[in-house]
């Protein structure tokens, strides 16, 4: 019995150790490798895939990076080699010419510079001649562009028509069936403006007075601006009228006269004008709504009294009260 327990204990320990080892191995396998190890592994695998000459199975060699400027262009090498060889020949020629003519090397710098410049000019001419001997392909592109430009200008250029040329445009011919016979236009009945119905004989007159306080007068220079601000207009009988239109057009609603005889105004001499008061009157029946017209007249009288420092009186020259207003409204309703 004790042996069996020992065997089971050993087997359990081995199983636990195996599980732990397998767990650590799985965790380590799942962890990403460091960058250095991966790069090293890639380099080793890449080297194993290539042969001794550096080519893989597809015959592709390793990538080589070439630094810029390590190799000159062929054209530059050709152009630089020609002047060097020519200059060497030119220097040898200069030395031969100097020895043949007996020139001493102790010449001044200015005297020696002139033949060198001449020889260099000759050398440049020789190089230019050698370069010009190479065949040069003509560039017809510029000529082609000019030709196309000329053609475009010719096509765009407008054609002027002289007076001697006549352009004949044929009018479309229509059959007899397409010609519609003109139908006489139906006469339009012009609606004449309706004339307002005559008001008839006046049946009543509503009167309001605006009178200055005792011992005072209303000055014309102050009265005229107030009348104009209230839309009064100077008109017939040399008095002011309030029209249905604020601009001074339309039917007369009520009028305003001087309370003193002869009851008229002179707009040209309003600065020298003065009076004890003015009177407003409205005849019944009147144009429009009588109650509305009376309301405008009453408001105008009260506004003038406030502006001129005066008082409003009724037709009997008594102080205006609410009782007088109700009496005037009753008279309006009796006629309308």
Curated annotation (Swiss-Prot):
Function statement: Essential cell division protein that stabilizes the FtsZ protofilaments by cross-linking them and that serves as a cytoplasmic membrane anchor for the Z ring. Also required for the recruitment to the septal ring of downstream cell division proteins.
Major localisation: membrane
Membrane topology, record value: Single-pass type I membrane protein
Biased composition range(s): Low complexity: 179-193
One Pfam family named in its UniProt record: ZipA_C
Ranges annotated as biased composition (Basic and acidic residues): 108-118
Cellular component annotations (GO), alphabetically ordered: cell division site; plasma membrane
Keywords from the UniProt entry: Cell cycle, Cell division, Cell inner membrane, Cell membrane, Membrane, Transmembrane, Transmembrane helix
Residue spans, topological domain Cytoplasmic: 28-336
Subunit comment: Interacts with FtsZ via their C-terminal domains.
Protein name listed in UniProt: Cell division protein ZipA
Disordered: annotated segments: 31-118, 174-200
Family the UniProt entry places it in: Belongs to the ZipA family.
Organism per entry: Shewanella denitrificans (strain OS217 / ATCC BAA-1090 / DSM 15013)
InterPro entries, per the entry: Cell_div_ZipA, ZipA_FtsZ-bd_C, ZipA_FtsZ-bd_C_sf
Compartments, as annotated in UniProt: Cell inner membrane
PANTHER family assigned: CELL DIVISION PROTEIN ZIPA
A biological process from GO: FtsZ-dependent cytokinesis
Polar residues composition bias: residue spans: 73-91
């Amino acid at each position: 019995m004790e042996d069996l327990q020992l065997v089971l204990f050993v087997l359990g320990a081995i199983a636990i150790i195996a599980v732990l080892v397998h767990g650590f191995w799985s965790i380590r396998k799942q962890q990403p490798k460091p960058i250095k190890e991966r790069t090293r592994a890639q380099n080793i695998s890449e080297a194993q895939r290539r042969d001794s000459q550096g080519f893989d199975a597809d015959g592709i060699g390793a990538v080589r990076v070439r630094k810029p400027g390590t190799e000159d262009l062929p054209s530059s090498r050709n152009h630089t080699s020609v002047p060097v060889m020519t200059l060497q020949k030119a220097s040898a020629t200069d030395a031969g010419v100097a020895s043949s003519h007996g020139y001493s090397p102790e010449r001044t710098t200015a005297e020696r510079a002139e033949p060198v410049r001449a020889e260099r000019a000759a050398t440049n001419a020789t190089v230019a001649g050698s370069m010009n001997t190479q065949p040069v392909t003509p560039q017809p592109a510029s000529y082609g562009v000019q030709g196309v430009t000329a053609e475009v200008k010719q096509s765009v250029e407008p054609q002027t028509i002289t007076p001697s040329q006549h352009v004949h445009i044929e009018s479309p011919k229509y059959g007899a069936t397409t010609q519609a016979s003109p139908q006489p236009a139906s006469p339009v009945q012009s609606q004449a403006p309706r004339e307002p119905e005559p008001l008839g004989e006046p049946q009543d007159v509503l009167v309001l007075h605006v009178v200055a306080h005792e011992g005072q007068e209303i000055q014309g220079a102050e009265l005229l601006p107030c009348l104009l601000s209230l839309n009064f207009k100077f008109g017939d009988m040399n008095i002011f009228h309030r029209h249905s239109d604020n601009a001074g057009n339309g039917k007369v609603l009520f009028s305003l006269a001087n309370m003193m005889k002869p009851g008229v105004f002179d707009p040209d001499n309003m600065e020298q004008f003065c009076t004890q008061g003015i009177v407003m009157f409205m005849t019944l029946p009147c144009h429009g709504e009588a109650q509305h017209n009376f309301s405008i007249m009453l408001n105008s009288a009260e506004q003038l009294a406030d502006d001129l420092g005066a008082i409003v009186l009724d037709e009997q020259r008594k102080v205006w009260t609410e009782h007088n207003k109700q009496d005037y409204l009753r008279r309006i309703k009796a006629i309308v």
